Regions:
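Hydrophobic anchor residue at the start of the ABC signature
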Residues: 43
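Conserved ABC ATPase "signature" region
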Residues: 7-24
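Conserved ABC ATPase signature
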Residues: 29-33, 37
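Conserved catalytic motifs of ABC-family nucleotide-binding domains
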Residues: 50
Length: 175
């Protein structure tokens, strides 16, 4: 990368701080780190290179809910602060629904869908047909639609489902 030691040190410390690692953790053997700390070290190592496009494959796999949310919050912050593209490869549609503004669905090396979370999850039946899951809240909305309680099931967040149900309660159409 052609960087001097001072710049490398600055980037490493900045990336470590960014992902929530303390200075004393940087000196530890990888065998002394927890799974979440190892994941943060790996992400910090890539962030230190300041890529314009950051591609992460299952970055939260094996982490507890708190660790998953911390990593995802850091990635959202990275995207927001740097303006760089972050691509998440994941089978967790719950995480995807809450953390991205665009979804590309691939199956057998072919692009099946490309759109906003709302656009993609409005095609929940197709996602299920190709073996992908949908957010639990979408499944609830699908069941409510089957029972005639919702006009459509293109819901992917709890807040949106609550909004629609409250609109129904108030006598307004929820579609």
């Amino acid at each position: 990368m052609g960087l001097d030691e001072k710049e490398i040190d600055r980037r490493v410390r900045s990336a470590a701080y960014f992902v929530g690692l303390r200075d004393d953790q940087l000196d530890k053997s990888p065998f002394e780190l927890s799974g979440g700390q190892k994941r943060r070290v790996a992400i910090a190592g890539v962030i230190a290179m300041e890529p314009k496009v950051l591609i992460l494959d299952e970055p939260t796999a094996g982490l507890d809910p708190r660790g998953r949310e911390a990593i995802l919050a850091q990635l959202r912050s990275y995207h927001k602060q740097k303006g760089n593209t972050v691509i998440l490869v994941s089978h967790s549609m719950e995480e995807i629904a809450r953390n991205v503004d665009r979804i590309v669905v691939m199956s057998h090396s072919h692009k099946l869908m490309d759109g906003t979370p709302e656009e993609v999850f409005s095609r929940a039946d197709e996602l299920l047909q190709v073996g992908l899951d949908v957010p639990q809240v979408t499944k609830v909305a699908m069941e409510l639609q089957k029972r005639g309680l919702l006009a459509d099931s293109s819901v992917y967040t709890i807040d949106e489902l609550v909004r629609r149900l409250l609109a129904l309660k108030g006598g307004e159409a929820a579609c």
